[in-house]
Amino acid sequence: MTKKPAAKAAEEKMIVGIDLGTSRSAISASNGKRNWVDSYVGWPKDFIARKVVGKSLLVGKDALEHRLSLDLYRPLKNGVIKEGTARDEEAVKELIHHLITLVQSKK
């Protein structure tokens, strides 16, 4: 097993700042990328909805566009997880994951 040189390992680290908001969430990264999305997360209501939207999860604008086919969550209220249910927590995790993928460098 080979170890990466310390300088190379430091280059691969990325510092991010995330602002989870009730209506919009934003991210800014040390690689210079910035982005924001509407704070909506949606899961298809059933198998037919899954076929219509073509994904198992939609975030932001995509979720709003397909809101009739989705169980739509707006998981934050006043900067806090809204109800504290498992689905709200999962929605926040998915929202954060989506934000991070928006600023990651494509290799």
State where each predicted segment sits.
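Conserved phosphate-binding catalytic cores of ATP/NTP-utilizing and phosphoryl-transfer enzymes
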Residues: M1-K13
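Short glycine-aspartate micro-motif
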Residues: I15-D19
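Conserved phosphate-binding loops in N-terminal lobes of ATP-dependent enzymes
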Residues: T22-K107
